[in-house]
Amino acid sequence: MIFKLFFLSFFACALSFLHGEKPHAVFVVGTHHYSPQKSMPMLASEIERLGFKTTVINPDWDPEKDKRGLPVLEALKKADLAIFYTRFLKIDDQQLVHITDYLKSGKPVVGFRTSTHGFNYPDEHPNQKWNDGFGRDVLGSPYLIHLSGPTRLKVEEG
């Protein structure tokens, strides 16, 4: 499934080649959970070999735990593809607007692993809708809390 999403996104970006420009993929790393701060720059290097220009927003701090959030989200203004690996962010409105503007553009989006629960605003916060909305409305998959269902095991004698 991930391969299909990536393929379709890259195909959509290939249209930029028709205009003589490299498609620009922007990676937004918004957590250190599962080490995307290491894997996303490697993935960016791989797609550069395929002819993409890449920008990796990957601060030295863990944006999930640091109030500074994510720097240079303005890079999304020139993106042909946005690739998110985020988790439980509480970024301020000045940062969030760059993401929402990109989403309104209708350009392709790919979300990895924890991006279904990319935001974690308090219940009364004006941006609280993004807590479930990013996964559900943008990525097409709601966040299902792991370990929330029953696990059943039956050992068969053999």
State where each predicted segment sits.
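A glycine-rich, often tryptophan-bearing local segment used as a flexible ligand/cofactor-contacting loop or short
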Residues: 84, 88-158
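Hydrophobic h-region of N-terminal signal peptides that target proteins for export
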Residues: 9-19
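A generic local structural motif
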Residues: 13, 67-71, 96-97
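Aromatic-Pro/Gly-enriched surface loop or interdomain linker
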Residues: 20-79
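Sec-dependent signal peptide recognition
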Residues: 1-8
